[in-house]
């Protein structure tokens, strides 16, 4: 790896690690959770986190009808408050009606409010054009990714880039688009 490549990889990891630290700095993990054995962040990471301005996030007006379902899924699946809300905001192009209905699909063929690929929707047993069922399924899926990968940053990377890719290469090897996705979500709830 070239020195520039190593530097870019390090910056990419920081984009994931810093928001993850911010999301969990005030939480106390319970024994048996993936974070319970994690050592505290070092002083340099704490200083870096302190230097980043917290971005405020609130749901757009178009999301009002989904707010209770999102909050319920976040609570049910033990997600940090706002994580699923911000994730679905990005996935659905700010709760655009044509995305939620399935009328507009992603370039890759993802459908609905949670932008599930057809195979993922089938695996989860959900109709991706049913926004309320998809909200719950997205929360359930994110919890399973968190349980598998041990932190919300890696879970988000797996949701966006694919579980197999994160297993094979690690979240730090994710492409810039995925790293930006993770940073936008975790940075907004930090």
Name each model feature, range by range:
Residues 32, 50-190:
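Catalytic glycan-binding domains that act on GlcNAc-containing polysaccharides
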Residues 25-44:
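Ser/Thr/Pro/Gly-rich low-complexity linker/stalk segments immediately outside membranes or between
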Residues 1-29:
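Single-pass alpha-helical membrane anchors
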Residues 18, 42, 82-83:
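General helical secondary-structure elements
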């Amino acid at each position: 790896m070239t020195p520039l490549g190593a530097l870019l990889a390090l910056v990419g990891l920081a984009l994931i690690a810093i928001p993850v630290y911010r999301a969990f700095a005030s939480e106390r993990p319970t024994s048996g959770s993936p974070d319970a054995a994690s050592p505290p962040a070092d002083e340099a990471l704490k200083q870096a986190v302190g230097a980043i301005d917290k971005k405020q996030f609130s749901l757009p007006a178009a999301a009002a009808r989904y707010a209770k379902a999102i909050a319920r899924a976040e609570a049910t699946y033990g997600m940090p408050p706002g994580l699923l809300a911000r994730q679905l905001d990005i996935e659905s192009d700010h709760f655009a009606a044509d995305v939620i209905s399935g009328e507009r699909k992603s370039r890759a063929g993802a459908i609905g409010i949670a932008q599930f690929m057809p195979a993922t929707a089938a695996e989860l047993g959900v109709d991706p054009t049913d926004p309320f069922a998809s909200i719950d399924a997205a929360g359930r899926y994110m919890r399973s990714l968190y349980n598998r990968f041990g932190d919300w940053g890696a879970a988000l990377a797996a949701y966006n880039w694919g579980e197999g890719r994160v297993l094979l290469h690690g979240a730090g090897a994710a492409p810039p688009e995925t790293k930006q996705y993770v940073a936008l979500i975790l940075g907004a709830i930090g």
